[in-house]
Amino acid sequence: MSSGRTVTLNTGYKIPQIGYGTWQAAPGEVGAGVFEALKVGYRHLDLAKVYGNQKEVGEGIKKALAEVPGLKREDIFITSKLWNNSHKPEDVEPALDDTLAELGLDYLDLYLIHWPVAFAPGADLFPKSEDGSEVQLNQNVSIVQTWKAMTELPKSKVRSVGVSNFTIEHLDAVIEATGVVPAVNQIERHPRLPNQPLIDYCAKKGIIITAYSAFGNNTKGLPLLVSSDEVKAVADNLSKKQGKTVTPAQVILAWSQIGGHTVIPKSVTKARIAENFQEVELDDEAIAALNKLGEKPQRFNIPYTYKPRWNINLFNTEEEKAAAHTAVIKL
């Protein structure tokens, strides 16, 4: 997979397949990470209001535009996301304006609905129930209403709009209601969660997939994918065959791009930022070994298990069966 490879969105804009993710990037690190990524050659940045670091990301972008020879704003594909407390239609454009102000930018390349879940409106990103154990949901606004507001955002402020963490049911509903197909669906995806029915649906509809948590995570007591024996064996095997060092991270990122998908690894160390951007080709044996990991699917990001709990069933996993609510698709 080529580090400079792009795919074309249904809006006609090109999105680089490898992006630089900023989730869980600590203040004091993320600005330097963004600068380093742009210096190395990344041209796709993935951000969100809820990450709490957009101001610093904006400073990293500004520094890169000033110091990386020839780099212009239009060379960088910048994604951000609408947070759950701003799902009321009248709150959508002000939330976009707030993100643009934090970043010091005039426009975004892509704006996503972060989750198909509305929280109680207001300044608090995580409004809590009285006892603090749950996030306060707003069941009086639907994802169809929010999506309609997204599609009506001025093109001068955002070039393409999309969604994140949407299932086939959610996508069907917003497309049917508005006739507008999201440009992107950003989802948890890795060899342990291949999610083939959703991938096939999005391919049929012309929706590009962006994978987050590409390396998995260790919330379930499982090792990170990059630390798993199976992925290490694939990397070792490819290293011998290709006569160069192939790392487990590069293996996962190459797998994530098969079929024209995009992926947004996060790192704040210079060596890893560069390593994640290197081109690696997988052979059929490597792909088969990685696909085997998905025979028993494992999802890591389940809001019902978060603290405070989101009392909502989004993905119909065993963990969510006790949830009191589902996504409000339409009212």
UniProtKB/Swiss-Prot annotation:
Can you state which reaction this protein catalyses?
glycerol + NADP(+) = L-glyceraldehyde + NADPH + H(+); glycerol + NADP(+) = D-glyceraldehyde + NADPH + H(+)
Give GO terms: molecular function aspect only.
glycerol dehydrogenase (NADP+) activity
Per the record, the pathway is: Carbohydrate acid metabolism
Sequence positions that bind NADP(+)? 213-276
| InterPro entries linked | AKR, AKR3B, Aldo/ket_reductase_CS, NADP_OxRdtase_dom, NADP_OxRdtase_dom_sf
Q: What class of enzyme is it?
A: oxidoreductase
For this UniProt record, give its keywords in alphabetical order, as a comma-separated list: Carbohydrate metabolism, NADP, Oxidoreductase
Entry EC no(s): 1.1.1.372
Residues engaged in binding substrate: H114
Give the SUPFAM superfamilies listed for this entry: NAD(P)-linked oxidoreductase
The keyword Oxidoreductase is assigned to this record: yes
Please name the catalytic residues of this protein. Y51
Describe the task this protein carries out.
Answer: Mediates the conversion of L-glyceraldehyde to glycerol in D-galacturonate catabolic process. Also able to reduce D-glyceraldehyde.
Stated family? Belongs to the aldo/keto reductase family.
Name-wise, this protein is D/L-glyceraldehyde reductase
Source organism per UniProt: Hypocrea jecorina (Trichoderma reesei)
